[in-house]
Amino acid sequence: MSTKNIFFVSFLLICLIPILLSAQDISVHKFIGKTRHDVIKKYGNPVHQDNSNPAMICMFYQTKTNRMIFVSDKNGVYQSEATANYNTESKARNAVDNFISSSVEDGFAVDTVTINDFELSKTGVKADLQMSENKITKNFEVSVKARRSED
């Protein structure tokens, strides 16, 4: 292979591997209190960023099956949301189970509200995890909404 081809392939791999590895990662609650730089380091540059209000800087990420929003101020990320779509209930349920297991390992307490609705908390962070079915598309959506808390 020529040097140009090796360079091109290397560049593609460097750009695509982080995207592929985090394609369905919805653990946005772990970024509460972290800096915008930490978010960009994990997910790359946002698709859109709104810097019009320094007290509420918003970063938006989107792929074909995943949407994420991070809201931050000078003290770090204080609100985050993620939504991932799955074509089967079992894949969505696995995502929920993995999310909960990973969160418990990170020190979060989990409270089951219903079979598809969970509240997670840890000092300084509260999050809601929900799974729902889109009756029209027959897809399943897993969403996380996290926020900084004062406890």
Show where each model-derived region lies:
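Bacterial N-terminal signal peptides
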Residues: 10-18
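General secondary-structure edge motif
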Residues: 3-4, 19-20, 76, 83
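A cross-family detector of function-defining hotspots
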Residues: 34-143, 147-151
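Intrinsically disordered/low-complexity terminal segments and short unstructured peptides
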Residues: 2-4, 21, 111, 136
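Boundary of Sec targeting at the N-terminus
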Residues: 23-25
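Bacterial N-terminal signal peptides that target proteins for export
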Residues: 1-11
